[in-house]
Every structure is written in structure tokens, then in C-alpha cells.
Amino acid sequence: MKRPLKVKMILPSLDEAKSPYWRPIKYSLFPPIGLATLAGYFRDDDEVVLLDQHVEKLDITDTPDLVCIQVYVTNAYRAYAIADSYRSRGVYVVMGGLHITALPEEAALHADTIIIGPGEEAFPRFINDFRNGCAQKRYAAQWRSIEDIPPVRRDLIKRSKYFVPNSLVVSRGCPHQCDFCYKDAFYEGWKILLYGSCRCGVERN
């Protein structure tokens, strides 16, 4: 598929964001920087839409070439329902995130492709294969680095819907290794961005 792609990137709302016992305002503080970063791997002529269900309504009646869904533990069932709806109409669905990495066999039942681990290395490989009609069922991160990630696609972020639209990622993971926490396993330690990368991010804001 050498023509430009029509892509929809979705962050389904977390269950607790819809609960009357939690403060919904918490979930409109920051935009989905992870998805906006991965969007940087698409070509300039690709038509990419980023939708955060915490701050806007999700329409699943469209038919893009590709739907990318970020999945956490507490939005997994909502993400699966969205994926199943798109796939029932022939739309290709790729899913990644913490829950996908933790339960890949379960997730594979609801996606055409799953990405295990952070997506900065695996996601561009998937995009290249998808364009060439040979996407695999599963991609796993072969390394975990944040040194060469593309600029965040802030043009896709609906800034007026967030309290802190200019948030930056300057590190990933955690310097501690608590047995009960997922972060050490998922991110494989604590990584920080070089000063130059952080400065560029500030200047682009």
C-alpha cells in the first residue's frame, strides 16, 4: 500500500474516568503523548487522526486503512469492543500498550497485529510491513531506547481540551525496582532523554 494511509489513533477512556467516585478532570490534564509520538513515524502525506476518548466522543462508523489503539488494564474491555467493531467491517487494527504486553494471547484475539513492549522500535517496523502488505501478527520491541524517537506530533493534539497541553516526556520508567510494579519489566529500567532532545521539545512547543 504505497498510497497515503488514512490512520486513526485511539486512546479509549479508562474505566475510572467514567466513575462518579473519581474526578474526571484528572483525565483531561495531559494529552496522549505516547500516541502523538508514534504518529511521528507516519509519512507527511498520511492522514492521521488522534482521538482521546477522555475529552471527545468516539465515532467508530468510519473506515480508515488502519486503527491504532493504546490499551491499559482499565480500558482493555473498551479497547477490545472498539477493535472488534472495526475489524467486523474489514478495518485493520493494531494494538499496543501495557495490557497488550501483559496479556498478549488474550489481546491477539481482538487485533490483527499486537505490539509488545514500548513501540518506538517495533511500530515503525510494523508500519513498513503494513505498507508492503506483509504485516505480522506480533511485533516485540528488540531494544528500549528513547534517544532517536521522532518529534511529538503536537499538530494532532486538540490543545484546548487539556489543562497541560504542552507536557513533555523527559524520562521513562523508574529508577527503583519494586517487585509489585510493572514499570521495571515494561521499560527495563529508567531512561532519561539527553539535554538536546529535551531542549528541542521545549522549543517546538
Where are these regions (language model features)?
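Conserved SAM/AdoMet-binding glycine-rich loop
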Residues: 2-10, 198-205
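Nucleotide donor/acceptor-binding cores
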Residues: 3-6, 65, 166
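Short glycine-rich His-centered loop
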Residues: 3-29
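Flexible loop residues that form catalytic
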Residues: 12-15, 72, 119, 186
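N-terminal [4Fe-4S]-dependent radical SAM core
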Residues: 18, 128-171
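Alpha-helix N-cap and loop-to-helix initiation/capping positions
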Residues: 26-30, 74, 114, 118, ...
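Glycine-rich beta-alpha loop elements in corrinoid/cobalamin-binding modules
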Residues: 34, 38-148
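Radical SAM [4Fe-4S] cluster-binding motif and immediate context
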Residues: 150-205
